[in-house]
A protein has these predicted regions:
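Membrane-embedded alpha-helical hairpins and interfacial helices in multi-pass inner-membrane proteins
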Residues: 34-47, 51, 85-93, 112-185
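Hydrophobic core segments of transmembrane alpha-helices in multi-pass, intramembrane catalytic enzymes
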Residues: 53-57, 95-102, 166
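Helix-adjacent hinge/juxtasegments
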Residues: 71-108
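Structural signal for membrane-spanning alpha-helices in multi-pass inner-membrane proteins
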Residues: 26, 30, 61, 80-84, ...
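Membrane-interface helix-boundary motifs at transmembrane edges
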Residues: 6-11, 108-117
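Hydrophobic transmembrane alpha-helices
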Residues: 2-62, 67-68
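Residue-level recognition of pore/gate-forming positions within transmembrane alpha-helices
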Residues: 23-27, 76-77, 99, 128
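Hydrophobic alpha-helical transmembrane segments
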Residues: 16-21, 55, 66, 70-74, ...
Length: 185
């Protein structure tokens, strides 16, 4: 009984630590891309092209499961906005929805026997679809003009380098840390 309680405490501690690390990475990594944008004169282009905040969400979800992924996805954009003003207030709720879905879906697929790239792709499709639905509801249902429905397709096109980065980097990272799975199960 005591071993079981000790093990459960270890799992909770590992998941809490992973959540904090995931949120930290999801807030810090985009700042590097913003600095690159400032130095190169491209502004926010590197951030919107490479989608750096998404990496931490996918990684923590695939490592520690759906609760960790969903919390990381919901909190990261909110904390980033509070600290840096990015993403913009208009995009914040939609990004929170999208990243929460990413974290939840990837976390639910964590132990499924399928390639990492398919787990990520499934989460990307569902996350973008739900984000698109939220944008359409805001625009047509609530008559909000803060975000136009044209952003749905334009963000996919501009974020293609980030999607490719996620498809290549995440399987490699998870392969490198596969021994850490013992801390979450």
């Amino acid at each position: 009984m005591e071993n079981t309680l000790t093990r459960k405490k270890q799992i909770i501690t590992a998941k809490a630590l992973t959540t904090v690390i995931g949120i930290t990475l999801s807030v810090a990594i985009p700042q590097l891309f913003h600095v690159i944008g400032i130095v190169s004169g491209t502004g926010s282009l590197p951030g919107s092209a490479f989608l750096p905040m998404h990496l931490g969400v996918f990684f923590t979800a695939l490592l520690a499961g759906p609760a960790v992924g969903a919390v990381t996805g919901a909190v990261s954009p909110l904390l980033s906005f509070a600290l840096t003003g990015m993403p913009s207030a208009a995009l914040l709720p939609f990004m929170m929805i999208e990243l929460t879905v990413y974290g939840l879906v990837c976390g639910l697929l964590k132990n499924k026997k399928m390639p990492v790239i398919l787990k990520v792709l499934t989460a990307q499709i569902l996350g973008r679809a739900i984000r698109a639905a939220a944008i359409l509801i805001a625009f047509y249902g609530f008559k909000s003009t803060a975000v136009s429905p044209t952003i749905i397709l334009s963000s996919i096109a501009s974020g293609l380098p980030g999607l490719i980065l996620q498809w290549t980097l995440l399987p490699l990272l998870l392969y490198r840390v596969k021994g850490l799975n013992k801390f979450y199960e």
